Amino acid sequence: MERQVPRVLLNSGHEMPVIGFGTAIDPLPEPEQLVSAILHAIEVGYRHFDTASAYMTEEPVGRAISEAMKRGLIKGREELFVTSKLWCADAHRDLIIPALKETLKRLGLDYLDLYLIHFPVRLKKEAVSLEHEIDDFRFEDHELLPFDIKGTWEAMEECSRLGLTKSIGVSNYGTVKISQLLQHATIPPAVNQVEMNVAWQQKKLREFCSKKGIHVTAWSPLAGIGAFWGSTVVIESKTLKEIAAAKGKSVAQVALRWIQDQGASCIVKSMNKDRMKQNLEIFGWKLSDEDGRKIEQIKQSRLYPAKLFINENSPYPSLEALWDGDL
């Protein structure tokens, strides 16, 4: 049975479902597999789909949307919220609008609901394609260019004015970089999509974004299980296991419910039909204040440092520089 997912009102005036279906999957499934998974996700109630140029999943997402309309699973495009992201090699002022148009072409859509800057990083256009990131991969220093916060955002604003996307935002931005962006913005970011879970709670960043009217979306809400950088720190959490047992819920449901209780939304990934459904069963109940206090005590650690952008001769010679000291 299809479930109704609540929506949050963004500062752009548009509403976004608070759970999205993520497509940053490694290893990359066969296109038909992903199309089938997205169709099932639509059947059980997902209405927000998150992709990116770097994920190489835009075409299957678009095919699934087209097929869903043909099958009558949705009445029209407007029932869905589609997010994609600007890759770093396209983060040049004159390349951003063409990059978004290419994304729309791959998706077979006239507009996005949300377009995000994937990282506050600019690469040379000819930089190596990020097909399969591995732990020791690094971009060469000559591939990493100074990031133009002002010019990049001005082009994102133009994407919005042209009607190519309804909302614009950022991803993996810390407080310093958001502050710098806001000095120049005429349209503020609607969303900051960041690593966030019970083991990396991002309290400082969330409070900052809230004051600025920017909604926070959590990627890796279950700590990236299956990714080379991922961890079982959430799923194997003793604290979450105890809370889950007491409430008759799964650990994953408790972890996702905690994110909702913080006023954030999340992007979940699963090709498993049962888990797809379970990940939507987090509404109609809440964690207690005592549960929240216990979760606050969980040891904190960033799981995905994005070392691929760190080079002593690059704009980000250290992780501290990339993440605004928030490690």
Curated annotation (Swiss-Prot):
Coiled coil: none annotated. GO terms for molecular function: oxidoreductase activity, acting on the CH-OH group of donors, NAD or NADP as acceptor. Optimum pH is 6.8-9.8. Pfam families: Aldo_ket_red. Substrate binds at H118. Keywords: Alkaloid metabolism, NADP, Oxidoreductase. The active site is at Y55. One of its GO terms (biological process) is ecgonone methyl ester catabolic process. Its EC number is 1.1.1.334. Strongly inhibited by Cu(2+) and Zn(2+) and to less than 30% by Co(2+) and Fe(2+). Expressed in young leaves. Detected in stems and flowers, but not in mature leaves or roots. Expressed in the palisade and spongy mesophyll tissue of leaves and sepals. InterPro entries: AKR (IPR020471), AKR4A/B (IPR044497), Aldo/ket_reductase_CS (IPR018170), NADP_OxRdtase_dom (IPR023210), NADP_OxRdtase_dom_sf (IPR036812). NADP(+) binds at residues 220-279. It catalyses: ecgonine methyl ester + NADP(+) = ecgonone methyl ester + NADPH + H(+). Catalyzes the stereospecific reduction of methylecgonone to methylecgonine, the penultimate step in cocaine biosynthesis. Can also use 6-hydroxytropinone, tropinone and nortropinone as substrates, but not 8-thiabicyclo[3.2.1]octan-3-one (TBON), cyclohexanone, cyclooctanone or N-methyl-4-piperidone. NADH can substitute for NADPH, but with a decreased activity. This is Methylecgonone reductase. It comes from Erythroxylum coca (Coca plant).
